[in-house]
Amino acid sequence: MPMFSHLLHTAKQLLHRAQPCQLCGIVRADLHSVCLDCWQQLPLHPQTIEKQELSIHVAGHYQYPLDHLIQQFKYEQQLHWQPLLSGILQQIRLPKVQAIVPMPISSQRLAERGYNQSMILAKDLAKQLNVPIWQPVIRLHQHSHCVENQQSLLLLYQNFD
């Protein structure tokens, strides 16, 4: 049986490497579904921002192509971007955490999309960090996509009360 699992693992690796880069279409190396050239061109700039006793960990600048990929993943059910987005999150140097808390979405958005994009990414990150997912937060308000920025921040803070 171990021989078959080794053969299966080797076959999966070969098939995985033969898949094209999701950004440029050429055969890729194994970097979260993109080739090395495309990975190096992503606007990745991991940093930590300290705001009001909170540490906010940022993966990169919200500009092309990241902004486009995030919008497709979030609004257009382009779930094939999951490996790339998860890989980007894995590049952030996070302190030791006890759990991952995904941002909840409204029941209306969950019904529209059929999935919670932050939960999908949280599962990958929790697995990598070997920590549980914790969901103490419940969205009290409907979606806030069209709400002014200040109102969005207010809704965010209210969700954590």
Predicted regions located by residue number:
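Glycine-rich phosphate/pyrophosphate-handling loop used in enzymes and phosphotransfer proteins
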Residues: 1-161
